[in-house]
Amino acid sequence: MAEHGESSEDRISEIDYEFLPELSALLGVDAFQVAKSQEEEEHKERMKMKKGFNSQMRSEAKRLKTFETYDTFRSWTPQEMAAAGFYHTGVRLGVQCFCCSLILFGNSLRKLPIERHKKLRPECEFLQGKDVGNIGKYDIRVKRPEKMLRGGKARYHEEEARLESFEDWPFYAHGTSPRVLSAAGFVFTGKRDTVQCFSCGGSLGNWEEGDDPWKEHAKWFPKCEFLQSKKSSEEIAQYIQSYEGFVHVTGEHFVKSWVRRELPMVSAYCNDSVFANEELRMDMFKDWPQESPVGVEALVRAGFFYTGKKDIVRCFSCGGCLEKWAEGDDPMEDHIKFFPECVFLQTLKSSAEVIPTLQSQYALPEATETTRESNHGDAAAVHSTVVDLGRSEAQWFQEARSLSEQLRDNYTKATFRHMNLPEVCSSLGTDHLLSCDVSIISKHISQPVQEALTIPEVFSNLNSVMCVEGETGSGKTTFLKRIAFLWASGCCPLLYRFQLVFYLSLSSITPDQGLANIICAQLLGAGGCISEVCLSSSIQQLQHQVLFLLDDYSGLASLPQALHTLITKNYLSRTCLLIAVHTNRVRDIRLYLGTSLEIQEFPFYNTVSVLRKFFSHDIICVEKLIIYFIDNKDLQGVYKTPLFVAAVCTDWIQNASAQDKFQDVTLFQSYMQYLSLKYKATAEPLQATVSSCGQLALTGLFSSCFEFNSDDLAEAGVDEDEKLTTLLMSKFTAQRLRPVYRFLGPLFQEFLAAVRLTELLSSDRQEDQDLGLYYLRQIDSPLKAINSFNIFLYYVSSHSSSKAAPTVVSHLLQLVDEKESLENMSENEDYMKLHPQTFLWFQFVRGLWLVSPESSSSFVSEHLLRLALIFAYESNTVAECSPFILQFLRGKTLALRVLNLQYFRDHPESLLLLRSLKVSINGNKMSSYVDYSFKTYFENLQPPAIDEEYTSAFEHISEWRRNFAQDEEIIKNYENIRPRALPDISEGYWKLSPKPCKIPKLEVQVNNTDAADQALLQVLMEVFSASQSIEFRLFNSSGFLESICPALELSKASVTKCSMSRLELSRAEQELLLTLPALQSLEVSETNQLPEQLFHNLHKFLGLKELCVRLDGKPNVLSVLPREFPNLLHMEKLSIQTSTESDLSKLVKFIQNFPNLHVFHLKCDFLSNCESLMAVLASCKKLREIEFSGRCFEAMTFVNILPNFVSLKILNLKDQQFPDKETSEKFAQALGSLRNLEELLVPTGDGIHQVAKLIVRQCLQLPCLRVLTFHDILDDDSVIEIARAATSGGFQKLENLDISMNHKITEEGYRNFFQALDNLPNLQELNICRNIPGRIQVQATTVKALGQCVSRLPSLIRLHMLSWLLDEEDMKVINDVKERHPQSKRLIIFWKLIVPFSPVILE
């Protein structure tokens, strides 16, 4: 170690790079890139953190305490980290060694903290076993007194002499002053930081900053003559009373303990490991193969215990396994050879010189074992004590000591360590759970305050009558057995104060049994015996030094009198009792308790710890489990008890395939199997309890109720006093007038509800079936099925019967037709609180719908199909469900990945019913759009001058850019770490060869991608070959088409559409496109390139139906179209953006030859000579959509032909100007004939302004109108006309009303409009924006009117009001309205304008 208090911080690496390829495959990301970025961030954090020896964290118990707020979803337990010298720093998840200052941020599944510590800082003096002041978590302050102080006792009567003894006082104990210690009568012994009173001989150590030597002296040795000469009896009593923990305990209780101590171990060593005790390891070799050439004793001495499989042994410390033993093998040598870093081996090496000294110093009498030492103080002192006792007193003393020995022997046997679990959990005994610390909170009966306790703190505070409460399987039994085991093993000095510890199971006793009889029957076995008289005398004499661990408590009435008295009249015996009680039963004994300990949920790191030990031979399996729970955070709590962990271990052992599933339902099923095995004798009552609890769970789930009262239980037929009920539910009474009941967890409630629903739907009774259908039909939207009730339905499918499955499948697949449910989706808030991950899922689906309802519908349909097929296959009812499935598939567009479903392998003909399948190929090229939106609009604008309270209406573009750049960087980093995922074509339909049916239409979306690699090309070749028709949509993906040329060459005749945006086509790609004979649709947009070679040869696409050309820079597109272009007689859609120089006659000629034209979009600035264009358009009777962008024509020429377009659905003229009133009136009159019109974007101009009211009235004759836009033409009179028309019953289908940029409307006009607007049941979007020069500052009455207007629009989800200057009070009104709105979760208000300047603040 460097100088104490200093530590050099070199760059270190926590990453196991050799395992990163494997991790990359499991996570689906580039783990090398993630690791590199993570290491850099962690190095920066390390450089900021304080270094140097931290004397305040010498105590392992204190280090353990720092992990109270530590994330439980980790691979290392706090116990492992604290034992390895680490404490939690509070900086992220960083832990730091108190000695060498090593800082670690990550956890490793394959390396324990001690191993990581050893690898990164082998020079750490703590690891090397040097004296750096470490205090073991179970260590105590009281030490064995030295037989002779240095220089004799007499020389230390003077304080100065005592002070001189502290010359070599260790550096780590400088927080306690030698002067204060010497003043309190202590002399430094020269060993560690141990001091001894010159007067009473009391010896103390483990001094920490803030300790008061006088207080410690008074607590542990209150009879000391020197102490009593310096402090009054009142002061001594105050010291004792204010001492934390160890009530009624003095140093004498530790010094004269009968417990045999194991030889000391290196402090970094985890000294409470189950098999640290040699006897325990020896006990595991009972079934060791007799033919093995290696002796058991040698294996045990080398640290190994038998795994029970073949001749495989495992080290209790490092977990290393060895097998295939041969003649002459030396276990210790092999241990050193294969696992040289093992801490146990390091311990032996470090103790090589210490052990002989210890053995000689603490030599045992010949009558006792040589490997242990009797720790009841000086032998002569004990002998004299016995001599002074009377004959009968001596008898109880001898019997008590003999009993103590028998108890310790019993607690270290395998029969005690193994729990009596049924065969479902037989593979996992208590052995694997004893080393796990349960999470405990302490609740003082007379105070409402709760406090989290570490196990050392629990041990320090054991006194009087206490209980440990918890659910079934929460670890109560394991906890009590661990206390007994640690006491017996000699590895826990905190428990030395107890001379007798009785672990008694109350489930196997009768009320007429005596206490001695119970102890003999349960703990002493054959030949063991103790009389009631001697037992009573021992308890009477030892009092606080007797600990009863009472398990399986079920009530006072069933207890024998002796135990009843110990609990209810503890003041008589003054013994210590710790009673394990189910949460439901605590109230029964609350009156007699001083403190209640409550076991919390089993931390996930304990689950990992158990599984790592149990499946050390298959650590990848444990890695997969952790990754599964990273992806499914909502499910992390299912391992809430050790019993559930036992269930998953058993399931993994019995079913190897289960290791890849990690399904939470398996846990619950295993738990229910455990209950059925345990309660075989009462199978019918158990089934009745499960059924009634299932009914309660089902009712609660559909009413979002997860807490119940007695009335709820009674209504469901649940007997709250039935013991079996406590196996499924918990009762909570603290701080409540009436008890509250909860299931073991929200997920477990859903599981039981699922069991009940299946039971109802499968019943022969019509009433049950009807009730089941009633609940099923409450899942009345696709979003509920795939979100709120997704987990529940998954549980139902795991129990689905042949009778129930078709009913569920039919219901689920009909939900996709519920269009309204998607548009009006809202989350169940109570459910979301319990399942935060579900809320994120909901937000994703809702966001997808807002952006693309079509994509959302496809996404939802896919999930409903997957769910339905799970039901069909789990229940073997595919044939019965197929009619519903086939009907569902008809006309659907789904993702390509659905073909991996088994159904498409079994029924490939169903593929023909689909409309299309979609596949997306996404790269990591980024395309920024920031500058395009602002460059031209703001360049001539001056910053607005406004009052200071309105500044929040503007956001500077630099801030917006900064946030945008940050988001862009996050996305870029995310994309970079995720390798391009290939479309999965490994299962289902793809297993068929040859393919009996082809994909009707394949839609290929390619985004931000460069050239395809060979792997992707191979996939596309197979997918293309299985497709009848292929459509491409390419965005920002230059070069991609050329890279997939081999795949296109094989499927030329299948490509029917190619849409390309923001990319440039190479000459090779243009030539490739020209070889596609079946191309029907071609779109090129948002690029400066004019692909002349392609356009010159468009006539070669004989089947072309759609052409869309929107190029930046407005090149003369018409000039490059071939003369033969009019020969494409099938053209249905023509969308052209061209320049003013274009030859208009050429366009006219084209249209003349397109009799089937449905859609015509033109963007240009012709202004004149457009009569011929209008004439030819008038002949296109099938036109459904017309859009003119730019000033394309003289108004009257178009108005004259407008009545011809009787099939028109979309008319977009918002860029056109109608200057005169006559033309505008004629336009308004013509609108009335467009009965099928759905979208109308009204032109601008003075003429339109004058007839705006007439246009509004004419729109009332358009019953299909969904979108209505007025820009720059409305005033107060015309805008109120819209409100009146709506109120009178017009515009019933209107979804989007855009009246933005109408600066002739005054504040009064807006206020009147808001007050009058009503009766628009389907309006989803309202736009009232203004530009910056036309910004409006309104009064409170106008804001109030707007709020009232919004309240009357029940479907509104977007309100645009840029350049409305609103202060804090105004926004409060708007937000209050939003909170109360029916669409409050979806309603978005756009009011903040992004600008490239800061507004001028008026003085």
Curated annotation (Swiss-Prot):
Say yes or no: keyword Metal-binding present.
yes
Q: What is the effect of changing residue 840 to R?
A: Strongly reduces production of IL1B in response to bacterial flagellin
- The answer on whether this UniProt entry bears the keyword Zinc reads yes
Name of the protein in question: Baculoviral IAP repeat-containing protein 1e
The protein's gene is named Naip5
Q: Where does Zn(2+) bind?
A: 315, 318, 335, 342
Specify which residues bind ATP according to the UniProt entry for this protein: 473-478
SUPFAM superfamilies in the cross-refs? Inhibitor of apoptosis (IAP) repeat (SSF57924), P-loop containing nucleoside triphosphate hydrolases (SSF52540), RNI-like (SSF52047)
Q: Which GO terms describe its biological process?
A: apoptotic process; defense response to bacterium; defense response to Gram-negative bacterium; detection of bacterium; inflammatory response; innate immune response; negative regulation of apoptotic process; positive regulation of interleukin-1 beta production
Whom does it interact with, and what assembly results? Component of the NLRC4 inflammasome, at least composed of NLRC4, caspase-1 (CASP1) and some NAIP protein. Flagellin binding by NAIP5 triggers assembly of the inflammasome, a huge complex that contains a single NAIP5 chain and multiple copies of NLRC4. (Microbial infection) Interacts with S.typhimurium (Salmonella) flagellin.
PANTHER family, A to Z: BACULOVIRAL IAP REPEAT-CONTAINING PROTEIN 1
